[in-house]
């Protein structure tokens, strides 16, 4: 993606760019992809492993073993602050450090609604339909009935309701590509082209990242993959970088794409069942927001 493109060109620029890699051994859930194996090799060798992804790209490199130690960070940054070439500062940290609940359940505490800091319990409970839960139950049933059904996420398994136990239950039929929405859509298109039944779940706000693949890979080829668009609403995420209402103008203008908008659980499940069963179109479903 764009971050890799920037890293690739940084060495050629040769300027005093300091690139900080906060390595807490996790994405939102667990990490996926070949790069993370090399990060582990670097951690295990205290940064001395000869196989070094960053050096292979022409970047200088230093390693900080305890990135939660403020003094160690000060020393590392003091060492590199006036350097005259690009350098990577690889920092080994613990996600949720200092808060027991977050240390014990890193995935849940990546993002939380307001909670009691003493107990970790949410301050507000929602009685509305949980469409992530509904989705997971439906897809697990479908995957058991048909080995061609594959559930795909790009680093956000919780949006589909796939807890660690459910991911384990689904086995190879659940695929997490990491935070790589472009690849997720291209993968879904390829699976559909070869007779599979891919279902890719993604937050509305991340649709823009995959627009090229939606148009070029999926819809031009008219491959019958299913795209579940979550939190397409004005009241969901309200950060300016995570607004969730651009999916309709983005998706609805792509030829061959069928975009559905159910209003209740019954309509949603009927549309999801149909979209998996049919073989004529790529289908997106705007999942009702709770």
Regions found by a protein language model. Give the residues of each.
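Active-site flanking residues adjacent to catalytic metal/cofactor-binding acidic residues
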Residues: 1, 21-22, 89, 285
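A short alpha/beta connector and helix-capping loop motif
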Residues: 2-21, 102, 197, 221-224
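Short, glycine/polar-rich helix-capping loops at beta-to-alpha or helix-loop-helix junctions
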Residues: 5, 28, 46-51, 159-162, ...
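Alpha-helical scaffold elements adjacent to nucleotide-binding pockets in ATP/GTP-utilizing enzyme cores
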Residues: 5-9, 34, 53, 75-79, ...
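Mobile "lid/hinge" segments at catalytic clefts and subdomain interfaces of large enzymes
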Residues: 11-45, 51-53, 221, 255
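Hydrophobic alpha-helical bundles that form the membrane domains of multi-pass transporters
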Residues: 19, 36, 47, 57-64, ...
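Thiamine diphosphate
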Residues: 59-76, 82-286
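Catalytic alpha/beta core of large soluble enzyme barrels
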Residues: 288-290
